[in-house]
């Protein structure tokens, strides 16, 4: 199985398929369509609009209205055209390298090989949905609605982002909000009449401290990061404008709402005569909590891993993925179940060859417990 897995992986790694390369992403979708056609699955290329390549839906039960499980991975990478030729697929010293080899081509191929090698009785008994989307690396802007519609038809979901370098799976992910806060002041000459100015930068500095204090790192595990401060034009002018760019993270959506409301409340406070503040939430990604239903899925993977001869380990991740969007519709979901790797989004990306076979077999074995 390892040899054919690597052959299939090489084919898709050697295709340029950055999110903006719709043609390249669609080539990957067509490649996987061919693979699933070969094992008797019904397949459909999914048109998700002009800003994304095609997605792919595959199922062993065409016409099913509900599914026992959804498998998801994304077809796109972050890399520009030409990267596949410059850094093609390679296996060396127990590692696979090449653009997207781990994130997320390893998961794309792992799902196919797990279902290719699944027991016939499991495929006969279960309705399985495979959803490959084309734009996860740009927040699934074109595909999130489709993913959530499909997830709402499924009892549970497994997202095959790569496992951690240690081999750990992911049982929960933080939610995220991104905010732009613009502070307006009054410009004045710094030498002649500074008293007539109202410094937007000074007000923004005080506001930065107040916004940061909304976090509760030790208690709730929430974080608020003012990552960018842009203000002023030249040093001899009292600055009339300053912009804050803010990232917030939380383990559950209730805590996220509290922080969002806190930022809005601070923006309405008085930060000085002549100072006004505008706060705009640019984006929001829901949390992926480890619910009781999620824990049941975790235990299925633990059992499958043990029967494959290894102990599954789990992490709670601060970053997000499509699993967050799937969790938003109330479906229990786990992530990071594909073969393990590291160095994602860089030339240092690699996939651990020693994790390929046991991850694929684990995915196939989980079907026995559904």
Task: Label the predicted regions.
Residues 79, 95-109, 189:
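Glycine/serine-rich anion-binding loops at beta->alpha junctions
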Residues 104-174:
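Acidic/histidine-rich catalytic neighborhood of metal-dependent amide-processing enzymes
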Residues 68-70, 96, 155-159, 180:
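Short glycine-aspartate micro-motif
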Residues 82, 92, 114-129, 211-221, ...:
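Phosphate-handling active-site elements
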Residues 75-76, 95, 131-139, 161-164, ...:
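Acidic, glycine-rich active-site loops and adjacent beta-strand->loop/helix elements
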Residues 1-99, 120, 323:
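Acidic/His- and Gly-rich active-site-bordering loop/insert found
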């Amino acid at each position: 199985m390892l040899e054919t897995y690597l052959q299939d992986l090489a084919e898709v790694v050697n295709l340029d398929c950055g999110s903006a390369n719709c043609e390249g992403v669609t080539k990957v979708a067509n490649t996987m369509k061919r693979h699933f056609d070969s094992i008797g699955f019904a397949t459909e290329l999914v048109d998700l609009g002009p800003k994304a390549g095609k997605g792919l839906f595959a199922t062993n039960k065409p016409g099913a209205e509900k599914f026992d499980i959804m498998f998801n991975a994304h077809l796109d990478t972050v890399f520009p055209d030409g990267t596949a030729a410059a850094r093609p697929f390679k296996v060396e010293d127990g590692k696979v390298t090449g653009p997207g080899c781990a994130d997320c081509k390893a998961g794309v191929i792992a799902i196919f090989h797990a279902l290719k090698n699944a027991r016939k009785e499991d495929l006969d008994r279960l309705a399985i949905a495979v959803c490959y989307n084309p734009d996860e690396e740009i927040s699934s802007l074109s595909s999130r609605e489709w993913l959530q519609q499909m997830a709402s038809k499924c009892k549970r979901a497994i997202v095959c982002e790569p496992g951690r370098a240690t081999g750990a799976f992911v049982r929960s992910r933080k939610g995220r909000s991104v905010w732009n806060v613009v502070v307006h002041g009054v410009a004045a000459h710094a030498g002649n009449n500074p008293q007539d100015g109202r410094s937007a930068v000074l007000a923004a500095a005080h506001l930065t401290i107040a916004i940061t204090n909304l976090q509760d790192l030790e208690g709730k595990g929430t974080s608020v990061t003012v990552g960018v401060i842009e203000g002023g034009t030249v040093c001899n002018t009292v600055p009339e404008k300053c912009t804050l760019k803010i990232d917030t993270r939380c383990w559950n959506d209730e805590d996220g709402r509290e922080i969002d409301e806190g930022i809005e409340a601070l923006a309405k406070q008085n930060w000085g005569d002549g100072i006004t503040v505008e706060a705009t939430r640019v984006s929001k990604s829901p949390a992926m909590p480890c619910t009781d239903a999620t824990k049941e899925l975790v235990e299925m993977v633990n059992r499958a891993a043990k029967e494959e001869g290894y102990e599954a380990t789990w992490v709670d991740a601060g970053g997000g993925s499509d699993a967050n969007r799937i969790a938003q519709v109330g479906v229990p979901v786990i992530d990071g179940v594909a073969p393990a790797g590291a160095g994602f989004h860089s030339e240092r990306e690699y996939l651990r060859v020693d994790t390929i076979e046991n991850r694929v077999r684990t995915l196939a074995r989980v079907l026995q417990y559904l």
